[in-house]
């Protein structure tokens, strides 16, 4: 099976990493739209344009399935994209909601991009099931992660401020509502003693096992920070190129 995966940058690689870890060996085409970072601080119209262009590319490449490995796109445009494009599309928000509802959690935290929080998709879906949801946006994190700057003292301070609303709230779970955030899971865990939820967890259950792994990575703007991030995230053979869309 040929699977297209896309995100605004390297964050979606956390989804790909989990799929490979669970032996979902397929042909993967990954697009990180780094030219248009960050999606979480963009507009709906721009996000539609970026997503449509990428999905049309996947269709041109004869992909069988597309995974939206971006919380911002999944929470704001998943219905639009599924209705518009004649290809199977999986978003990462729906499986997250289903997982949490089935676990009977009662008190959840959500840290995500501005646009994911503003969409209210996760919070409204969970509150319908009598789950209390505390939300807080973290608008600077994606850019800092992309630039490999999250080990600097001043940026750990920013992260600490983003996590402050979740402290001492007796949370069952803190949702990492952006696929970039698992990249800094170690730093987050050092600042808050709450179980962390990675949106990659339930995706693998939606994909059948495969036998042959092939990974092609494309970034719409390629630089050394991206190359470093890819090396740190993925533990498999891959080809990587810059892609003009």
Language-model segment annotations:
Residues 1-245:
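Non-catalytic structural scaffold of enzyme domains
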